[in-house]
């Protein structure tokens, strides 16, 4: 190699060595990016957040255009349990700081977007997160290196040409590109991102809105009171969130146009594929809707002589002229900054606007590239809340736990309990856990049984579609069977065409629990960890493969699954049947009697009484058990027997009966 070659090699070496390196690079300081930064910061990891604007949450400085968020801020629940309250707090991020709850930033049920901007700024400052502001990453590529964690580094270039090197890339840029239309006359269409939000600009106008989503209805709601009429047009039928149980569908706060449409107050809703349409502007500046094929067959250059559908069909629904046409079709992910070497592609069908990722939120094309937040919604699009703060705060935590195990050898957090605590552990989680509640059928709790079912290990909020890879992803073993705790709606209850208010829609009887419609806990039992093939060929509409046994806890109007007879007893009997054991608790006297009369003791007596632990019954404890419907009141039975002339001796009231139905609780 000559002198010039040495100089080039030296220059390249210096360029590589001068790259600032971070183990974790996060793109975007929105809610998802800050949430991941908070977890990385608390774990003491080497990370940097890159934000193109001068402050966090720049999306909320512009959107929603009419400034009202549709994520609820329920400040009062009647409960003091912080985890339970997060079920109904759709705006807070997860942290250990009680001051960083959104209820301290707004009293409104539907807050103003500026409150979210203020909240995110405080979140970053109070936690001391490492954010590099005014840094717009314009290009991302790969640099293969066998020494790197994933076999390559991610090379980021900003608007100034500065290059950064990362071992793991976490993309939390959201959906930043407005979805456009492309038909003749589309140049006349105004976009949601730029149209006026002042109702005075629409007084006495005829307005056509393209789209049937929340942004379209938000726009219509703002101008309903001043326009002549508002028509809405989209390819698909309107999807109402209370019917689909999907928070991303049209919410009641914005559906005023549906009211005026159905009550025939001039406003209207139409369905048609936009790609077949065209817009024509007449000499008065009005816009007419026509069909593309009519333009193709017309040679006239005069706007007023172009054929319209009403020429052949005089009751064509859209024969009226419009003053304005507004596009409200949502957004798509910005793929433009990613080099082809990353193989980051879009999803399929309705999820085309999202990157194609695994259920672990990792790109299918590049190991070590994870998609977070709204952009990760392809995993649960139109199913759960993964595209929104109250959903992705938990999926981001799941990704962090996966990374902690993969790169730092820290297993998925778990707690080990004796088997006697199995029923109570499940009941506690289904009644208070927020991640299970919001990310239903996406994140599930996993219970790993120990040998001989003497104990169990409890893992919270694992991505259930990755169940076959649980051991590899978590560092935990599932050799002796497992339970999966999921929250589900009834399989035939949700859909845009469903009547969810029909009479007798709820299930109240225990024996009909499997027919429950509303969100309720479902427990799956597997003797062995399902395989990839099991997951792939699971029954239609099932979130998991067919289990060894399954149990539905009957739906509850109060979402309070603590009823001793209606909820706890059926669950405990199900668990006992799966494990072939007795999960009841006993007083010391009963355990003593069992040791004299049984060859096999219940686990409670084995793990408590035989280790010199346990509780002796007293009059007050027995009375509490009777009042709680946990024990039979034998005193009352004895008095009744005496009145009937039956002089048989009733069991001692301070000792649990071996054959009492009440004792089964």
From Swiss-Prot:
Keywords: Endoplasmic reticulum, FAD, Flavoprotein, Glycoprotein, Oxidoreductase, Signal. Disulfide bonds: none annotated. InterPro entries: Auxin_biosynth/cation_transpt (IPR050982), FAD/NAD-bd_sf (IPR036188). A motif (Prevents secretion from ER) lies at residues 662-665. GO terms for biological process: ERAD pathway. It is found in: Endoplasmic reticulum lumen. Its cofactor is FAD. Pfam families: Pyr_redox_3. The keyword Glycoprotein applies. GO terms for cellular component: endoplasmic reticulum lumen. Residues 642-665 are annotated as: Disordered. Residues 1-17 form the signal peptide. Glycans are attached at residue 136. N-glycosylated. One of its GO terms (molecular function) is oxidoreductase activity. It comes from the Eukaryota. Interacts with SEL1L. May interact with OS9 and DNAJC10. Interacts with TXNDC16. Belongs to the FOXRED2 family. Probable flavoprotein which may function in endoplasmic reticulum associated degradation (ERAD). May bind non-native proteins in the endoplasmic reticulum and target them to the ubiquitination machinery for subsequent degradation. This is FAD-dependent oxidoreductase domain-containing protein 2. It comes from Mus musculus.
């Amino acid at each position: 190699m000559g002198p010039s070659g040495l100089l080039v090699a030296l220059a390249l070496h210096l360029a590589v060595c001068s790259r600032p390196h971070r183990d974790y690079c996060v793109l975007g300081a929105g809610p998802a990016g800050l949430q991941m930064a908070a977890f990385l910061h608390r774990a003491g990891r080497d990370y940097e957040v890159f934000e193109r604007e001068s402050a966090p949450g720049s999306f909320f400085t512009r959107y929603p255009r009419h400034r009202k968020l549709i994520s609820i801020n329920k400040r009062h629940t009647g409960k003091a349990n912080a985890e339970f309250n997060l079920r109904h707090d759709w705006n807070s991020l997860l942290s250990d700081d009680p001051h960083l709850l959104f209820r301290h930033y707004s009293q409104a049920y539907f807050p103003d977007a500026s409150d979210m901007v203020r909240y995110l700024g405080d979140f970053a400052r109070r936690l001391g997160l490492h954010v590099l502001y005014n840094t717009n990453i314009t290009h991302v590529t790969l640099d293969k290196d066998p020494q790197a964690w994933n076999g390559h580094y991610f090379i980021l270039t900003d608007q100034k040409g500065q290059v950064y090197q990362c071992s793991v890339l976490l993309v939390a840029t959201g959906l930043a590109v407005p979805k456009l239309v492309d038909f003749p006359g589309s140049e006349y269409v105004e976009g949601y991102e730029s149209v006026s939000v002042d109702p005075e600009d629409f007084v006495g106008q005829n307005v056509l809105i393209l789209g049937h989503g929340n942004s379209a209805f938000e726009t219509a709601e703002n101008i309903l009171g001043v326009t002549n009429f508002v028509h809405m047009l989209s390819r698909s039928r309107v999807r109402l969130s209370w019917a689909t149980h999907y928070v991303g569908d049209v919410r009641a706060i914005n559906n005023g146009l549906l009211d005026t449409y159905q009550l025939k107050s001039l406003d209207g809703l139409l369905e048609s594929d936009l790609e077949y349409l065209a817009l024509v502007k007449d000499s008065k500046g009005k816009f007419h809707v026509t069909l593309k094929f009519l333009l193709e067959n017309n040679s006239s250059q005069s706007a007023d002589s172009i054929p319209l559908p009403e020429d052949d069909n005089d009751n064509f629904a859209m024969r009226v002229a419009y003053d304005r046409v507004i596009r409200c079709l949502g957004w798509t992910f910005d793929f433009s900054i990613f080099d082809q070497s990353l193989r980051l592609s879009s999803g399929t069908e309705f999820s085309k606007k999202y990157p194609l990722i695994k259920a672990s939120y990792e790109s299918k094309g590049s190991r070590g590239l994870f998609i977070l937040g709204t952009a990760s919604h392809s995993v649960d699009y139109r199913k759960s809340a993964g595209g929104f703060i109250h959903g992705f705060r938990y999926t981001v935590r799941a990704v962090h736990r996966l990374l902690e195990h993969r790169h730092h050898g820290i297993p998925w957090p778990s707690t080990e309990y004796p088997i006697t605590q199995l029923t109570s552990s499940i009941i506690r989680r289904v009644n208070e856990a927020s991640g299970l509640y919001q990310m239903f059928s996406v994140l599930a709790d996993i219970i790993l049984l120990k040998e001989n079912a003497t104990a169990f290990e409890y893992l919270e909020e694992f991505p259930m579609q990755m169940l076959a890879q649980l051991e590899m992803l978590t560092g935990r073993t599932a050799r002796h069977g497992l339970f999966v705790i999921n929250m589900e709606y009834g399989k035939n209850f949700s859909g845009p065409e469903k009547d969810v208010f029909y009479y007798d829609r709820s299930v109240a009887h225990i024996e009909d629990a499997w027919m429950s419609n509303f969100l309720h806990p479902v427990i799956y039992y597997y003797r062995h960890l399902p395989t990839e093939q099991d997951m792939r060929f699971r029954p239609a509409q099932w979130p998991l493969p067919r289990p060894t046994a399954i149990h539905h806890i009957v739906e509850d109007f109060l979402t309070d699954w603590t009823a001793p007879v209606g909820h706890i007893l059926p669950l405990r009997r199900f668990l006992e049947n799966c494990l072939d054991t007795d999960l009841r608790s006993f007083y010391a006297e009963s355990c003593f009697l069992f040791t004299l009369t049984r060859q096999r003791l219940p686990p409670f007596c084995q793990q408590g009484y035989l280790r010199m632990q346990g509780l002796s019954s007293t009059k007050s404890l027995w009375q509490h058990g009777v009042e709680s419907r946990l024990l039979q009141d034998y005193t009352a039975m004895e008095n009744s027997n005496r009145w009937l002339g039956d002089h048989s001796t009733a069991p001692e009231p301070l000792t649990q009966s071996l054959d009492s139905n009440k004792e089964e609780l």
